[in-house]
Amino acid sequence: MQDIKTYLSTAPVLATLWFSSLAGLLIEINRFFPDALTFPFFSF
């Protein structure tokens, strides 16, 4: 039972950190490449 409580208390924290870092990354990409449909570092 203690393991379930530990899991439920850490999963939202990890999800919040992951989504916050992902949102920050997307914001920074849009800051350097505004309104880009294709990104220069993805074109081969």
UniProtKB/Swiss-Prot annotation:
One of its GO terms (cellular component) is chloroplast thylakoid membrane. One of its GO terms (biological process) is photosynthesis. The chain crosses the membrane at residues 7-27. The keyword Chloroplast applies. Coiled coil: none annotated. Signal peptide: none annotated. It is a single-pass membrane protein. InterPro entries: PSI_PsaJ (IPR002615), PSI_PsaJ_sf (IPR036062). Keywords: Chloroplast, Membrane, Photosynthesis, Photosystem I, Plastid, Thylakoid, Transmembrane, Transmembrane helix. It comes from the Eukaryota. Gene3D superfamilies: Single helix bin (1.20.5.510). Disulfide bonds: none annotated. It is found in: Plastid, Chloroplast thylakoid membrane. May help in the organization of the PsaE and PsaF subunits. Belongs to the PsaJ family. HAMAP family: PSI_PsaJ. This is Photosystem I reaction center subunit IX. It comes from Welwitschia mirabilis. The lineage of its organism: Eukaryota, Viridiplantae, Streptophyta, Embryophyta, Tracheophyta. The gene is psaJ.
